[in-house]
């Protein structure tokens, strides 16, 4: 049986200066398909909140277009006008309520 943990700091908090992560576990970006339709944002919020509650320190969203030219397909998820802010706020609020951190890709 191991008496030494190979990654002793993995579950320790990490102070980034502007925020502190509860641990060093990062969930990399993956495209779920939920970010492509505004009707699915409540499901996307629940998806990320569940992982935040499950002790993931930082999650990275699937690709979110920063502008129309950055779109990979017609009518993608984006954050390039004020009308798109509320649906993204739904996700960040759910994650923060579960004591998580999230970063948009």
Label every model-predicted segment:
Residues 1-105:
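Flavin-dependent oxidoreductase catalytic cores
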């Amino acid at each position: 049986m191991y008496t030494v943990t190979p990654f002793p700091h993995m579950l320790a908090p990490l102070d980034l200066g502007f925020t502190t992560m509860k641990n060093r576990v990062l969930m990399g970006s993956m495209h779920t398909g939920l970010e492509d339709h505004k009707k699915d944002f409540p499901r996307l919020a629940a998806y990320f909140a569940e992982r935040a509650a499950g002790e993931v320190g930082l999650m990275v969203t699937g690709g979110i277009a920063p502008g129309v030219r950055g779109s990979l397909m017609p009518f993608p998820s984006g954050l390039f006008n004020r009308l798109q802010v509320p649906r993204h706020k739904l996700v960040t609020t759910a994650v923060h309520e579960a004591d998580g951190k999230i970063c948009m890709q």
